[in-house]
């Protein structure tokens, strides 16, 4: 049978048709129904009608185009194809109805689909009684998009997709299933072949260096149990253990622990240490280990380094079972330019800005999201909701917020483009951040968000309706820089830097602050936290004990990076385990015991956490004793007698009969002393309790241990 091919037929055969459904499949023709099938490498094809009748199709083009009449009146049919010596029966993807409804297209076009991940990506489903996978991807400027994978020999002609709405390409692939590997094969605006792309909405990906996406049936994922109620409240204790999953601990052969192995070990350790939360460095899929996850290519996929999405669910569930909240580092500020990723996705700057003065980070060599694009904002906002809904995550810490807020962030003069008012503020990014926080708290009111924001941008953690950005918390980067600078000085010089301890309290309640000693402070030549401590060996460890006690007595929630809790000597390395063997030595196990007791005290004393973010919870008592490097303040809870006196001595001297006024007469209990012998100290202190002196004003006469902090509470 000789078939005269149309231009449309050639467009399909050559892989440049935007809607192959217009040509392929069953179509009325000359009073009957013609079936057109494109099956590359097939040597013969038959069509089987719904009534069981079989008719051969003629090969109309050597690329694998077969054409012939459909037997019977029903539009349903099956194909039988021979590939060499193998004959298979298969369904024609071009006989099935669309995946996206008109309402789906409306929400996607409007950018308000909060469950974007239920529509885009790869979803196992059943259409007209046939099992398969529905694939949907955004590529508005592509000339042609195909899905390629294990189900079609990675041949881009086999499953060419159709475009609908404002650039959403879709196709139901019969016979594809969960576990299949796939990518999208695109022709750009001018018909040029683009690098094959991983699915931006994939729920799983291959282990690097491979880059294919993996079909996951998200409906079968177990739901982690919820975290303890109100674990993120401003009045609740929040002590966060920050963890890089690949280097917390390793097994024999220097191999990563899997999510399930981590689930058996990490939550128990975090609970034993008294932390309330664990914060994972980004778990979204990323190609380069050395980025620590901060250059993600798969925002919707837990990295395959440690297992499957089901395995990640098990880790979250184990944390919640141990009473631990789970926070994820989330990276909506930039992404890498790996060929299989989001960059130049459809042959144009789809997710990023086209102009490198807006679209590329000079520091990191990464691309910047275009927050002025409706589809991009929808993609990012839905991703935040995805982690909270699908995996039961309790909070998101947003990375590098300052780089999002300022158009001139780390750019030279003349190397950036002002906003429409001529200013440096990124108006679209600000709108996105506010929308993100609105959506998160609207859908998950007991969750939280935290901003890593290093500038003086006002009201980061204040309500949007009052002009704020809407975050729950802000990392206090100023406190971290000032206090680490102070503690790194030899005690003899600290009196000249006394203000670095005092200054943070001038703004301590302008935001809801988290005090971070994060991964960023123990890498790139900064040394470990212990490595910053001056003096001989005893002084180094005493300084560290005093500094940690100072941190836990200071207003604000707490965050400590793994390894710091036992005084790791060396800088953190992402490609090896923490130095757990150090705990064989008392000076390191003493630091660990100190952190465990500080966490316990912080959680048990309302005065230390109830008004963490409220100026009524803090009162300076001694600020001007610079010559002694000594500070004292009162922490307060809601109850009148919920009080905790904190005294920190950053000098190596012991001070006898040191007088401090207190609000209540009677006995005050020394509930914590960082100079305890159990922590490696000298056991100088007040014997566990002290009574106020006789007089009109209650006053304590105290013995202040060297390079140490003591906490005292009034007896009931």
UniProtKB/Swiss-Prot annotation:
Enzyme Commission number: 2.4.1.18
MF term (GO), any: 1,4-alpha-glucan branching enzyme activity
Active site per the UniProt annotation: 399, 452
Pathway: Glycan biosynthesis; glycogen biosynthesis
UniProt catalytic activity: Transfers a segment of a (1->4)-alpha-D-glucan chain to a primary hydroxy group in a similar glucan chain
PANTHER family named in the record: 1,4-ALPHA-GLUCAN-BRANCHING ENZYME
Stated family: Belongs to the glycosyl hydrolase 13 family. GlgB subfamily.
Protein name: 1,4-alpha-glucan branching enzyme GlgB
Organism of derivation: Rhodopseudomonas palustris (strain ATCC BAA-98 / CGA009)
Gene encoding the protein: glgB
């Amino acid at each position: 049978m000789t078939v005269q091919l149309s231009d449309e037929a050639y467009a399909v055969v050559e892989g440049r048709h935007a809607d192959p459904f217009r040509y392929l499949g069953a179509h009325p023709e000359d009073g009957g129904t013609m079936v057109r099938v494109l099956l590359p490498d097939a040597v013969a094809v038959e069509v089987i009608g719904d009534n069981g009748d079989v008719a051969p199709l003629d090969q109309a083009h050597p690329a694998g185009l077969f054409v012939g009449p459909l037997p019977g009146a029903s539009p349903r049919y099956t194909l039988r194809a021979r590939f060499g010596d193998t004959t298979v029966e298969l369904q024609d993807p071009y006989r099935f109805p669309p995946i996206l409804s008109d309402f789906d297209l409306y929400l996607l076009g409007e950018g308000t689909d909060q469950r974007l991940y239920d529509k885009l990506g790869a979803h196992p489903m059943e259409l007209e009684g046939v099992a398969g996978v529905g694939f949907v991807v955004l590529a508005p400027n592509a000339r042609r998009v195909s899905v390629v994978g294990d189900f079609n020999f990675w041949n881009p002609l086999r499953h060419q997709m159709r475009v609908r709405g404002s650039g959403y390409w879709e196709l139901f692939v019969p016979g594809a299933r969960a576990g299949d590997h796939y990518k999208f094969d695109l022709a750009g605006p001018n018909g040029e072949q683009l690098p094959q792309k991983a699915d931006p909405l994939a729920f799983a990906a291959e282990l690097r260096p491979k880059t294919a996406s993996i079909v996951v049936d998200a409906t079968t994922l177990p739901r982690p149990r919820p975290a303890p109620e109100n674990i993120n409240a401003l009045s609740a204790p929040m002590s966060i253990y920050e963890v890089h999953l690949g280097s917390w601990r390793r097994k024999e052969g220097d191999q990563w622990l899997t999510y399930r192995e981590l689930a058996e070990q990490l939550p128990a350790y975090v609970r034993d240490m008294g932390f309330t939360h664990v914060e994972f460095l980004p778990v979204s899929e990323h190609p380069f280990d050395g980025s620590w996850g901060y250059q993600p290519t798969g925002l919707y996929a837990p990295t395959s380094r440690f297992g499957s999405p089901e395995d990640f669910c098990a880790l979250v569930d184990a944390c919640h079972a141990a009473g631990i909240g789970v926070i994820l580092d989330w990276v909506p500020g930039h992404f890498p330019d790996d060929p299989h990723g989001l960059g130049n996705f459809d042959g144009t700057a789809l997710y990023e800005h086209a102009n490198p003065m807006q679209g590329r980070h000079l520091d990191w060599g990464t691309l910047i999201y275009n927050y002025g694009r409706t589809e991009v904002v929808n993609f990012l906002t839905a991703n935040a909701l995805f982690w909270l809904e699908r995996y039961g995550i309790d909070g998101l810490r947003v990375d590098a917020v300052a780089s999002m807020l300022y158009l001139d962030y780390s750019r030279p003069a003349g190397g950036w483009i002002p906003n429409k008012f001529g200013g440096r503020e990124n108006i679209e990014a600000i709108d996105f951040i506010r929308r993100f926080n609105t959506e998160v708290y609207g859908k998950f009111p007991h969750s939280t968000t935290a901003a890593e924001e290093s500038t003086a941008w006002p009201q980061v953690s204040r309500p949007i309706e009052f002009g704020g950005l809407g975050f729950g918390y802000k990392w206090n980067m100023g406190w971290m820089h000032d206090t680490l600078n102070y503690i790194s000085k030899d005690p003899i010089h600290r009196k000249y830097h006394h203000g670095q301890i005092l200054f943070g309290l001038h703004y301590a309640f302008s935001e809801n602050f988290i005090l971070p000693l994060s991964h960023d402070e123990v890498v790139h030549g900064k040394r470990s936290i212990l490595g910053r401590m001056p003096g001989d060996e005893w002084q180094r460890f005493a300084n560290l004990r005093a500094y940690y006690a100072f941190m836990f007595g200071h207003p604000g929630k707490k965050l400590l990076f793994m390894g710091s809790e036992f005084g790791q000597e060396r800088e953190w390395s992402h490609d090896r385990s923490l130095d757990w063997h150090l705990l064989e030595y008392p000076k390191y196990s003493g630091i660990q015991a100190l952190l465990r007791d500080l966490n316990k005290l912080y959680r048990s004393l309302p005065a230390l956490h109830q008004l963490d973010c409220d100026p009524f919870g803090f009162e300076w008592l001694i600020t001007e004793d610079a010559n002694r490097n000594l500070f004292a303040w009162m922490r307060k809870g809601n109850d009148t007698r919920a009080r905790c006196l904190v005294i920190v001595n950053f000098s190596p001297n012991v001070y006898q009969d040191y007088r401090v006024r207190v609000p209540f007469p009677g006995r005050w209990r020394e509930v914590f002393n960082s100079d305890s012998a159990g922590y490696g100290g000298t056991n100088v202190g007040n014997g566990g309790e002290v009574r106020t002196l006789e007089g009109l004003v209650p006053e304590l006469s105290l013995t202040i241990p060297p390079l140490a902090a003591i906490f005292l509470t009034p007896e009931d």
